[in-house]
UniProtKB/Swiss-Prot annotation:
Region feature (Catalytic): 122-427
Encoding gene, per UniProt annotation: GCNT1
Species name: Bos taurus (Bovine)
Assembly with partners or alone: Interacts with GOLPH3; may control GCNT1 retention in the Golgi.
Pfam families: Branch (PF02485)
The protein's name in its UniProt record: Beta-1,3-galactosyl-O-glycosyl-glycoprotein beta-1,6-N-acetylglucosaminyltransferase
Protein purpose: Glycosyltransferase that catalyzes the transfer of an N-acetylglucosamine (GlcNAc) moiety in beta1-6 linkage from UDP-GlcNAc onto mucin-type core 1 O-glycan to form the branched mucin-type core 2 O-glycan. The catalysis is metal ion-independent and occurs with inversion of the anomeric configuration of sugar donor. Selectively involved in synthesis of mucin-type core 2 O-glycans that serve as scaffolds for the display of selectin ligand sialyl Lewis X epitope by myeloid cells, with an impact on homeostasis and recruitment to inflammatory sites. Can also act on glycolipid substrates.
C-alpha cells in the first residue's frame, strides 16, 4: 500500500514535469557538450608521451630525421631489457575490456569530437585483421573518433582468443563492431574482397550518415590526423580516390585463368575463363580504397556489378583490379573517365602509401622513394628512420608497420599524431 502511494506521489502532475525537465536538461547538456568550443575542454591527459617504451628515445628528434637518435633506436632495440619487455596478449585484452570504462581511460581513447568540422563529417572504416591484437588496438585508437564507424573483420582462421579480444575491444564502443559474417581469408583469393564486402554491407546498414569508407588492414597506420583526413576527403567533393591504371600485360594471366583454393593456397587450374561481363576494360590497382557512400551503395545493389563480382571470384588477386575497374565505369558515383589521362597511380592516390622493394633507390636519381631495411613480400616495414620522409607524403595511411619489428616507429608516429590533433584545440 505504501509503495503504491509512493508511486502515486512520485508521478504526480508536478513531478512528471520535473522528470521531463530533467531529461530535457540532460539532452541539452549533451548536445551543447558536443558542439561547445573545444578550447574550453582540457584534453592534456590524452597525450601519449609517457607511453614511450624507453625514456632514452627522443621522438621529436626521430621525426626530424636525427641520425644519432635513429641509431640510438637501433641499439635500444637490441638490449635485453627491451627484448624482454612486457607485452599484452589476447587474454590481457579480454581481461582489460571486461571493464570498458577503465580500458578506455587507460588506453586514452578520444571520446568526444575534437571539432564541429570533424563531428559533421563521419567516416566509416573497414579493418581486416587476423593477428597481433596490440597492433589492432593501436590502429583503432589512432583513428578512433566517436562520430565515426568501425567494422573489424577477423579472419575465421584466427585464434579464438584473438577473436574474443577483438570482440572485447569492440564491445567497449557503440560505433565499433566485429563483422556479422567472417571469412577464412586465403592470400590473393576472393575471400580478401569478401571480407571488405561484409564490412561494407554492415556499415551501410548500420548508419546512413557517414560520408566516405576507407578500408584498412591490421598493419596500416595513419600518417594524418582525423581533421586532416576529413579535410582531404572534403576536397574530393564526392569523388572516390584509389589506384586505377592501365592493366599491364603480365597481370592478365591472373584473370584469364580459373583459380581454386587447394590445400589452403590459391592454385591456377589451367583452364581458361570467359571474358568479363563488362563493356569497360579491366584496370589495375590495389586492395586499398577511399570511396563515397554512394559508391558503396552502387556496388552493393547494382546487378551489373554483382555479375562482375561473381565472375571475378575464381581469379587471382581480384582485389588488385576489381575496385580499380569499378572506379572507371561511367555510371558509378564518383568514378573517373575511361581515358588514360585519368589513370591514377598508387603515388597519386591518397588511400595508402606503400614502399615496394623493387622501386626503392636514390631519390635524387629518380627513384620514387628511398631504400628500406626490412621487407615482407617485397613491401617495406617502416622503421623509425622512415618517419621523417613518410610524414611529407600526401597519403592518409601507410603500410606496413609492425610492433615486433620496430615498436619505436609506431610509438613516435602515434605520439606525434595525437599531439598534433590536440594542439589544434589550443586558443
Amino acid at each position: 500500500m505504501l509503495r503504491k502511494l509512493w508511486r502515486r506521489k512520485l508521478f504526480s502532475f508536478p513531478t512528471k514535469y520535473y522528470f521531463l525537465f530533467l531529461a530535457f536538461s540532460v539532452v541539452t547538456f549533451t548536445v551543447l557538450r558536443i558542439h561547445q568550443k573545444t578550447e574550453f575542454v582540457n584534453f592534456g591527459h590524452l597525450e601519449l608521451f609517457e607511453e614511450n617504451p624507453s625514456s632514452n628515445i627522443n621522438c621529436t628528434k626521430i621525426l626530424q630525421g636525427d641520425v644519432d637518435e635513429i641509431q640510438k633506436v637501433k641499439l635500444e632495440s637490441l638490449t635485453v631489457k627491451f627484448k624482454k619487455r612486457a607485452r599484452w596478449t589476447n587474454y590481457d585484452y579480454i581481461n582489460m575490456t571486461g571493464d570498458c570504462a577503465s580500458f578506455i581511460k587507460k588506453r586514452k581513447y578520444i571520446t568526444e569530437p575534437l571539432s564541429k568540422e570533424e563531428a559533421g563529417f563521419p567516416i566509416a572504416y573497414s579493418i581486416v585483421v587476423h593477428h597481433k591484437i596490440e597492433m589492432l588496438d593501436r590502429l583503432l585508437r589512432a583513428i578512433y573518433m566517436p562520430q565515426n564507424f568501425y567494422c573489424i573483420h577477423v579472419d575465421a582462421k584466427s585464434e579464438k582468443s584473438f577473436l574474443a579480444a577483438a570482440v572485447g575491444i569492440a564491445s567497449c564502443f557503440s560505433n565499433v563492431f566485429v563483422a556479422s559474417q567472417l571469412e577464412s581469408v586465403v592470400y590473393a583469393s576472393w575471400s580478401r574482397v569478401q571480407a571488405d564486402l561484409n564490412c561494407m554491407q554492415d556499415l551501410y546498414q548500420m548508419n546512413a550518415g557517414w560520408k566516405y569508407l576507407i578500408n584498412l588492414c591490421g598493419m596500416d597506420f595513419p600518417i594524418k590526423t582525423n581533421l586532416e583526413i576529413v579535410r582531404k576527403l572534403k576536397l574530393l567533393m564526392g569523388e572516390n580516390n584509389l589506384e586505377t591504371e592501365k592493366m599491364p600485360s603480365h597481370k592478365k594471366e591472373r584473370w584469364k585463368k580459373h583459380y581454386e583454393v587447394v590445400n589452403g593456397k590459391l592454385t591456377n587450374m589451367g583452364t581458361d575463363k570467359i571474358h568479363p561481363p563488362l563493356e569497360t576494360p579491366l584496370f589495375s590497382g590495389s586492395a586499398h580504397f577511399v570511396v563515397s557512400r554512394e559508391y558503396v551503395e552502387y556496388v552493393l545493389q547494382n546487378q551489373n556489378i554483382q555479375k562482375f563480382m561473381e565472375w571475378a571470384k575464381d581469379t587471382y588477386s581480384p582485389d588488385e583490379y576489381l575496385w580499380a575497374t569499378i572506379q572507371r565505369i561511367p555510371e558509378v558515383p564518383g568514378s573517373l573517365s575511361l581515358s588514360y589521362k585519368y589513370d591514377t597511380s598508387d603515388m597519386q592516390a591518397i588511400a595508402r602509401f606503400v614502399k615496394w622493394q623493387y622501386f626503392e633507390g636514390d631519390v635524387s636519381k629518380g627513384a620514387p622513394y628511398p631504400p628500406c631495411s626490412v621487407h615482407v613480400r617485397s613491401v617495406c616495414v617502416f622503421g623509425a628512420g622512415d618517419l621523417n620522409w613518410l610524414l611529407h607524403v600526401h597519403h592518409l595511411f601507410a603500410n606496413k608497420f609492425d610492433t615486433d619489428i620496430d615498436l619505436f616507429a609506431i610509438q613516435c608516429l602515434d605520439e606525434h599524431l595525437r599531439h598534433k590533433a590536440l594542439e589544434t584545440l589550443k586558443p
